[in-house]
Amino acid sequence: MPRRRVIGQRKILPDPKFGSELLAKFVNILMVDGKKSTAETIVYNALETLAQRSGKNELEAFEVALDNVRPTVEVKSRRVGGSTYQVPVEVRPVRRNALAMRWIVEAARKRGDKSMALRLANELSDAAENKGTAVKKREDVHRMAEANKAFAHYRW
């Protein structure tokens, strides 16, 4: 722990097209080797495709997809007297968003479609319909937390 002042979290600039901080964070997570303009192009193309499929506007469709992937509980390892327990803990809102976005990008990268924009659009539309790899990941995390509910009293 720092003995001096606590440094605040950096303010993220909203993305130029929609003015959304959440979308700017998503672009940053998708970005590889500092190529932000490439990442922005991929995200905007994916959102355009997603909006055409769903009939909603881009931000709404993105928000719905993200909402279906956000975890509410996760497990953390806790050592108690020589044995390690998987203790279920509630996920803070900022981490919820971060995990959801990370899982969506991971799942999109593993897909076998043509372009990254198409892969991302497909993963987001799957997430909006409550299916796909990212949603499965969230369900697995929730299942782990449910299975280890007995150790919830070890929370710190």
Swiss-Prot record:
Which Pfam families would you find in this protein's record? Ribosomal_S7
Q: Which family does the record claim for this protein?
A: Belongs to the universal ribosomal protein uS7 family.
Q: What is this protein called?
A: Small ribosomal subunit protein uS7
Superkingdom of this entry's organism? Bacteria
Alphabetized HAMAP family for the sequence: Ribosomal_uS7_B
Q: Under the GO molecular function aspect, what terms does this record hold?
A: rRNA binding; structural constituent of ribosome; tRNA binding
Signal peptide: which range, if any? none
One GO cellular component term: small ribosomal subunit
- Keyword Transcription among record annotations: no
Its quaternary organisation is:
Part of the 30S ribosomal subunit. Contacts proteins S9 and S11.
Q: Which Gene3D superfamilies match?
A: Ribosomal protein S7 domain
Q: Which gene encodes it?
A: rpsG
What cystine linkages occur within this chain?
none
